[in-house]
């Protein structure tokens, strides 16, 4: 009897409605208990799961389905036979047909049935799960089939033109809105020509085209190509641009890729009233920070006092307690903003590193084209006497990048060469004299 209670307690903990995701440690704890006595454990755990599946809390049902899948994969044939039994498959189908069960729960049931059917296909005695899957496919095909990936077809010229026009119109309306805001804030209205004023008053007010900035994934997607974006159901993707007719490019957790539009839903942008309401609620939460600190300080001082008789403490507590859900919501909001900013920083850092690398390569390529030859050479003007061969020119030993050829020059007082010949001698050229006893010729 104690063993049965342990299993029921473990099942209740693993399928708690307060859990927002599967806790695999709790799930494996149930599996460990069932493995201790496979015969009785399989019976007790399935009875506890049946009871949990009949509750109205959708979250409890979702956690119970995850527990069923975990038990089927880890606890042997006894549990598998109980899961594939006519009684349990009938309970799952009852949930599929129940109108009060949410569509998300029904899709999860169909997903688990599909998974178990694939796991049980080698054992004919577990055919009940595959029969249930076929029954769901026949009567509720929308619960099993995920949308097909659309083809990557190029946008037509008209579609691209329409997109450019929508963007131009959006920018125009944004500029007008900014100018109106400047006037409303007390700034001087910008001077406009009479023709512009006439055209502005004559044009009817056009609705601002809706620009999709964020979308929310409604299905899981595992990328099959390098340029595609992988995501999980519930992820919020920032839309960058439309690449193909049915594919967009987006940003998620620092990664950029394309994704199909039929796998996501548009996140509507909040209206001005909603933004103002949210800001007011946030301000109200932060305004209560002093009361929270005051309550904490009084509780520290009154540790040995019965707080139920302290009216001030009771009043403060009743004031700050309703703030908990709002604080939790704000934590989630700013956590998402932090993640978005971290992703943006990562993308910006990668772009900056790529740009610097390309700039460095371009600089090295340009430098190599302007590097003069470092070979030792002797200067001898044509048509001159033999003594000129005694002047020898060589590049300096230091590795200095020379300037452009247009700035090359040599001091004529040092060389004594004609001006039209001095331009061909690079700057910083060393002149080494050999023994010469005669005078330089005069030009």
Curated annotation (Swiss-Prot):
Alphabetized InterPro entries for the sequence: ENTH_VHS, SH3-like_dom_sf, SH3_domain, STAM, UIM_dom, VHS_dom
Region Disordered, annotated ranges: 178-206, 374-443
Function recorded in the entry: Component of the ESCRT-0 complex which is the sorting receptor for ubiquitinated cargo proteins at the multivesicular body (MVB).
Any Gene Ontology CC annotation: vacuolar membrane
Keyword Membrane set for record: yes
Domain named VHS: residues: 14-144
Protein family membership: Belongs to the STAM family.
UIM domain span: 162-181
Oligomeric and partner information: Component of the ESCRT-0 complex composed of HSE1 and VPS27.
Entry's Gene Ontology molecular function annotations: phosphatidylinositol binding; protein domain specific binding; protein heterodimerization activity; ubiquitin binding
Annotated SUPFAM superfamilies: ENTH/VHS domain, SH3-domain
Designated name of the protein: Class E vacuolar protein-sorting machinery protein HSE1
Biased composition (Polar residues): 374-383, 391-400
Organism of origin: Eremothecium gossypii (strain ATCC 10895 / CBS 109.51 / FGSC 9923 / NRRL Y-1056) (Yeast)
GO biological process: ATP export; microautophagy; positive regulation of protein maturation; protein secretion; protein targeting to vacuole; protein transport to vacuole involved in ubiquitin-dependent protein catabolic process via the multivesicular body sorting pathway
Alphabetical keyword list: Endosome, Membrane, Protein transport, SH3 domain, Transport
Membrane topology per record: Peripheral membrane protein
Cell compartments where the protein resides: Endosome membrane
Span of domain SH3: 210-269
């Amino acid at each position: 009897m104690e063993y049965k209670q342990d299993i029921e307690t473990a099942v209740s903990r693993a399928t708690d409605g307060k859990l927002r995701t599967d806790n695999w440690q709790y799930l494996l704890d149930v599996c460990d208990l069932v493995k201790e006595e496979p015969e009785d454990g399989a019976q007790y755990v399935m009875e506890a799961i049946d009871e949990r599946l009949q509750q109205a809390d959708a979250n409890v049902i979702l956690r119970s389905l995850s527990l069923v899948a975990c038990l089927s994969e880890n606890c042997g044939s006894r549990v598998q036979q109980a899961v594939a039994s006519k009684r349990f498959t009938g309970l799952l189908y009852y949930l599929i047909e129940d109108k009060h069960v949410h569509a998300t729960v029904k899709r999860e049931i169909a997903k688990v049935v599909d998974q178990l059917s694939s796991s049980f296909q080698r054992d004919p005695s577990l055919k009940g799960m595959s029969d249930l899957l076929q029954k769901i496919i026949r009567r509720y095909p929308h619960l099993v089939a995920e949308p097909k990936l659309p083809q990557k077809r190029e946008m037509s010229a008209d579609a691209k033109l329409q997109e450019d026009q929508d963007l131009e119109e959006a920018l125009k309306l944004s500029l007008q809105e900014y100018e109106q805001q400047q006037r409303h804030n007390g700034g001087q209205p910008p001077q406009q020509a009479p023709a512009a004023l006439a055209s502005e008053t004559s044009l009817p007010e056009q609705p601002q085209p809706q620009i999709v900035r964020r979308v929310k994934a409604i299905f899981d997607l595992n990328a099959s190509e390098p340029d595609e974006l992988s995501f999980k159901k519930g992820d919020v993707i920032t839309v960058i641009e439309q690449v193909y007719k049915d594919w967009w490019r987006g940003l998620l957790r620092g990664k950029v890729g394309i994704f199909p539009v039929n796998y996501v839903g548009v996140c509507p942008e909040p209206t001005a009233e909603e933004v103002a309401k949210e800001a007011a609620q946030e301000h109200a939460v932060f305004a209560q920070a002093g009361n929270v600190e005051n309550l904490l300080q009084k509780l520290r001082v009154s540790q040995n006092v019965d707080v139920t008789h302290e009216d001030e403490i009771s009043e403060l507590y009743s004031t700050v307690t309703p703030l908990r859900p709002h604080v939790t919501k704000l934590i989630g909001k700013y956590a998402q903003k932090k993640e978005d900013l971290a992703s943006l920083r990562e993308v910006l850092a990668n772009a900056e590193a790529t740009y610097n690398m390309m700039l460095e390569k371009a600089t090295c390529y340009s430098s190599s084209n302007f590097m003069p030859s470092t070979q030792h050479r002797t200067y001898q003007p044509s048509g001159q006497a033999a003594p000129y061969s005694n002047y020898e020119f060589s590049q300096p030993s230091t590795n200095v990048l020379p300037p452009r050829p247009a700035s090359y020059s040599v001091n004529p007082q040092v060389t004594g060469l004609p001006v039209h010949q001095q331009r061909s001698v690079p700057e910083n050229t060393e002149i080494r004299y050999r023994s010469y006893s005669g005078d330089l010729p005069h030009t």
